[in-house]
From Swiss-Prot:
Quaternary structure and interacting proteins, as annotated: NDH-1 is composed of 14 different subunits. Subunits NuoA, H, J, K, L, M, N constitute the membrane sector of the complex.
Function of the protein: NDH-1 shuttles electrons from NADH, via FMN and iron-sulfur (Fe-S) centers, to quinones in the respiratory chain. The immediate electron acceptor for the enzyme in this species is believed to be a menaquinone. Couples the redox reaction to proton translocation (for every two electrons transferred, four hydrogen ions are translocated across the cytoplasmic membrane), and thus conserves the redox energy in a proton gradient.
Source taxon at top rank: Bacteria
Biological classification of the source: Bacteria, Pseudomonadati, Bacteroidota, Cytophagia, Cytophagales
Key word Cell inner membrane present: yes
Organism: Cytophaga hutchinsonii (strain ATCC 33406 / DSM 1761 / CIP 103989 / NBRC 15051 / NCIMB 9469 / D465)
Gene coding for it: nuoA
InterPro entries, sorted: NAD(P)H_OxRDtase_bac/plastid, NADH_UbQ/plastoQ_OxRdtase_su3, NDAH_ubi_oxred_su3_sf
Full protein name: NADH-quinone oxidoreductase subunit A
Length: 126
């Protein structure tokens, strides 16, 4: 098996098994499932109660803004962990001040972004 495509064989087998499983599941659901359609089955299910009113409720855009800011700063903070864990390794392999200065610049850019958010009063609820 010196073929250049031989290493892709397990992936192809897994893909075929997955597609086969999906096909068998959908086909058996279609064959064994109930065929009777009624108006009651087309209604929305809301914890056993009949739905009342409009499902569209308006709420403040602040929730989206806070969620976006949380995700933004949370993802950036995730970059701190690998840096902190590997700081000693980087200090031995490269100049330790170089890595420290780069992380300091990264933290400064985060701080500038956070100051911008505060100055724009994005976190004020009034």
């Amino acid at each position: 098996m010196n073929n250049k495509y031989a290493e892709y064989l397990p992936i192809a087998i897994q893909l075929m098994v997955t597609l086969g499983f999906i096909s068998v599941t959908l086909l058996s659901s279609w064959l064994l499932g109930p065929k009777v359609k009624s108006k009651k089955k087309l209604d929305a299910f809301e914890s056993g109660l009949d739905p009342v009113g409009n499902a569209r409720v308006q709420f403040s855009i602040k929730y989206f803004l806070v969620a976006t800011l949380f995700v933004l700063f949370d993802v950036e903070v995730i970059f701190f962990y690998p840096w902190a864990v590997n700081f000693n390794y980087f200090a031995e392999a490269v100049n330790k001040w170089e890595g420290f200065v780069k992380m300091l610049l990264f933290m400064t850019s985060l701080l500038i972004g956070f100051i911008y958010v505060i100055k724009k009063k994005a976190l004020d609820w009034e």
